[in-house]
């Protein structure tokens, strides 16, 4: 984290704002984007005097100003988009980074047990590896091996890892995901 230049950060799909508040404590001025009004209210209270601006918006329509963020975080949010929504957003995210700015993204991958459950249950697959869900998110996309890396291939990939982790939910043995850390060239 020390090598990331301080400045403005963008936290997409911030939820309750845990990452946004932590980033603000590390010296960033944070735009925290969240569509769920319950979470935006919680974050508005949680942030206190921290430099966190709550942006109530769907991430697919949030206007990312070109070259304005030294850090963009998309933790556990991009898999709730269809690939046809993901690629245009990924382009805007890359354009939104300042020269030398960093991007951190984390997603579910197709070897996650949830993928198998949805496929075997007959849940409607609306795009490859993308299933229609009931509820707020509407869809879930499980990234194929190397897909997250390809989405952000315009950046210098500093770290890319696909792994399985023990799940917090005792009914699920593990989760599978991909983590990407990348940097925009000077």
Stretches with model-predicted labels:
Residues 1-10, 15-64, 81, 88, ...:
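Class I (Rossmann-like) S-adenosyl-L-methionine-dependent methyltransferase catalytic domain
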Residues 73:
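A conserved beta-strand element that flanks and buttresses the S-adenosyl-L-methionine
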Residues 76-80:
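Short catalytic micro-motifs in class I SAM-dependent methyltransferases
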Residues 87-99:
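A short glycine-rich, Lys/Arg-flanked "PGG" loop and its adjoining helix->strand segment in the class I
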């Amino acid at each position: 984290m020390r090598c990331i230049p301080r400045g403005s950060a963008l936290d997409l799909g911030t939820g309750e704002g845990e990452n946004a508040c932590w980033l603000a404590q590390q010296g960033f001025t944070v735009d925290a984007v969240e569509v769920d009004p319950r979470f935006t209210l919680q974050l508005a209270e949680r942030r206190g005097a921290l430099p966190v601006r709550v942006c109530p918006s769907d991430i697919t329509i949030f206007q990312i100003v070109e070259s304005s963020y030294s850090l963009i975080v998309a933790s556990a949010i991009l898999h709730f988009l269809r690939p046809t929504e993901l690629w245009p957003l990924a382009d805007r995210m890359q354009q939104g980074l300042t020269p030398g700015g960093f991007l951190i993204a984390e997603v579910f991958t197709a070897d996650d047990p949830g993928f198998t459950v949805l496929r075997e249950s007959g849940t409607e697959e609306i795009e490859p590896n993308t299933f229609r869900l009931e509820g707020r998110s509407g869809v879930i996309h499980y990234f194929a091996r190397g897909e997250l890396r390809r989405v952000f291939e315009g950046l210098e990939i500093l770290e890319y890892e696909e792994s399985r982790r023990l799940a917090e939910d005792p009914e699920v043995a593990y989760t599978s995901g991909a983590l990407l850390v990348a940097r925009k060239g000077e």
